[in-house]
A protein has these predicted regions:
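Conserved AMP-binding/adenylation subdomain of ANL enzymes
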Residues: 167-184, 191-231, 245
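Conserved structural elements of the adenylate-forming
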Residues: 33-38, 159-180, 188, 297, ...
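Conserved ATP/PPi-binding loop(s) of AMP-dependent carboxylate-activating enzymes
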Residues: 308-312, 323-353, 357, 389-391
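Gly/Ser/Thr-rich phosphate-binding loop
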Residues: 230-234, 243-302, 314
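Conserved AMP-binding/adenylate-forming
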Residues: 25, 41-85, 187-190, 390
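Conserved AMP-binding A3 loop
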Residues: 28-30, 144-171
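Conserved pre-ATP/AMP-binding loop-to-beta segment of ANL
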Residues: 15-16, 130-148, 155, 178-184
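AMP-binding/adenylate-forming catalytic core of the ANL superfamily
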Residues: 85, 337, 342-343, 365-452, ...
């Protein structure tokens, strides 16, 4: 069993159908197979063998798909690496995971001891010395891919999926996404972070990927009008960007707009719907699990509704003892279903040791309503404790972001001698907006309980985020 069969089958069934369109280039499933086959042979010639770790560095577009499928076809365990990671972040990954080589499009200047460097088409294959030519995840039979978690509140962890897991997960995700052969997705996320429930699923089921020429609202809308995709799939920042599109520009009414990767604040969803006449759906995904929740329209309130459990998945809200809580009670969000991850790397930890009676604890605190929908309150590790009261950064950020002229915000806690912790907030003004901090503080005092109010509030030019678009909650050393 190998996920490469997704491509061979797609090329057999739909050889002339477009698989991916990006930067003026459209590549069919047949062409994608041909290029992947050629690169597979090149990988074998340079020494890649089944079970070895293979890094993949490529931009969103055809070459990412070519590199991913060529690596899978060779039997390697593929680990996509974002082009936008800092050198120290990449070097840390290379320390933790003994990759045999890195397949890269363009330059790759990180600390990778090389024994050979081979150029093949648009790719270079940088091979490490022979002591790295070993099975990268020997505890996982038929390992397929590795991806590091985003590390929003701590160190990132390597997550391993087997080919069996990829088969199960893609089968479940296409049902949850409600897409079918011949559909197209306007893709506005980094492929290096989203490639199983999305990219591999799309290829398996004959769904085209459309990569816009850029991330400006004008470019996104132009791509949507040109390709008429059934779905736009992006992060909350994409929704915010489109809200600020010049007047007169519109999105296709038949196109679903899906937000994923982090919380979409309700006020942004409402503004988007007023602007375009289209509701925003949220999908809740985790690399350890897949897409367990979604298809819910973003609702009001102090949190973000991520809908209900998608087909084949179960969800529960657990107390500290691991017991299920009734509707209306806040606890730890737990999910389970097909395609659960196989293991963590560095240190190695099989999934069975990380799960609680088969449940994966997401790290989010949430409430389940009586109709089964889930409202995420915030990350357990991000909760700020102010004199015994719990403050969720996401709630405070939502109120700050509702203030006219605010583009984004970040809220976090700092130690305080009397209250234990205090709330600190940073806010990014929209371009051209003039924000009176005193007026903003007054606005917050009218919307929030006293203990939730920021003790320090300042305007900043930008908010630090992880490469997958999530707010970075911890200072990076």
């Amino acid at each position: 069993m190998n996920a490469y069969s997704f491509l061979t089958r797609a090329a057999e069934l739909w050889p002339s159908k477009v698989a991916v369109a990006a930067r003026g280039e459209s590549v069919t499933f047949g062409e994608l197979l041909k290029r992947s086959e050629e690169l597979k042979h090149a990988l074998f010639e340079t020494g890649i063998r089944p079970g070895m770790g293979l890094g993949l560095v490529a931009a969103n577009g055809p070459e990412f798909l070519v590199g991913l499928f060529a690596g899978l076809a060779s039997g390697a365990v593929v680990m996509p690496i974002s082009e936008n990671l800092r050198p120290q972040e990449v070097n840390r990954m290379l320390e933790l995971v003994p990759l045999a080589g890195v397949l890269h499009e363009g330059s790759f200047s990180h600390d990778l001891p090389r024994s050979t460097e081979t150029q093949r088409g648009r790719f270079s294959i940088a091979m490490r010395p022979r002591e790295y030519h070993l099975k990268v995840a020997p505890g996982v039979p038929n390992a397929a891919v590795i991806r590091f978690t985003s590390g929003t509140t701590g160190s990132a962890k390597g997550v391993v999926l087997s080919h069996q897991t990829v088969f199960e997960r893609t089968e479940a995700s296409v049902e949850g996404l409600q897409l079918s052969q011949g559909d197209a997705v306007l893709w506005v996320l980094p492929m290096a972070y989203h490639f199983v429930v999305s990219i591999l699923t799309y290829v398996r089921y004959g769904i085209a990927v459309v990569v816009p020429d850029g991330d400006s609202p004008e470019q996104l809308i132009s791509s949507a009008q040109q390709h008429s995709p059934q779905m736009l799939y992006g992060a909350p920042a994409v929704v915010q960007s489109l809200i600020n599109a010049p007047s007169g520009l519109s999105l296709p009414r038949s196109m679903r707009v899906v937000s994923t990767s982090s919380c979409l604040y309700p006020q942004h969803a409402r503004t988007f719907e007023q602007r375009f006449g289209t509701s925003v759906e949220q999908l809740y995904g985790l690399f350890e699990v897949g897409l367990p929740l979604g298809s819910g329209l973003v609702s009001g309130g102090d949190g973000a509704s991520v809908g209900r459990a998608l087909p084949r998945y179960e969800v529960a809200i657990l107390d500290p003892a691991g017991q299920s809580l009734p509707a209306g009670h806040m606890g730890s969000l737990a999910v389970r279903g097909p395609g659960m991850f196989d293991a963590y790397l560095a240190p190695y930890r099989p999934a069975a040791d990380a799960l609680l009676h088969g449940w994966f604890l997401t790290g989010d605190l949430a409430v389940q309503s009586y109709d089964g929908s889930i409202t995420v309150k915030g990350r357990e590790k991000s909760v700020i404790n102010v004199a015994g009261n719990k403050v969720f950064p996401e709630e405070v950020e939502g109120v700050i972001n509702s203030y006219p002229g605010i583009q984004a915000s970040r809220v976090y806690g700092l130690e305080h001698t009397q209250s234990g912790e205090m709330v600190v907030a940073e806010a990014v003004p929209q371009q051209g907006a003039s924000i009176d901090v005193t007026a903003l503080a007054t606005y917050l005092s009218e919307k929030l309980s006293r203990y939730k109010l920021p003790s320090a509030l300042r305007l900043v030019d930008s908010i630090e985020r992880t490469d997958s678009g999530k707010i970075r909650r911890v200072a990076q050393g």
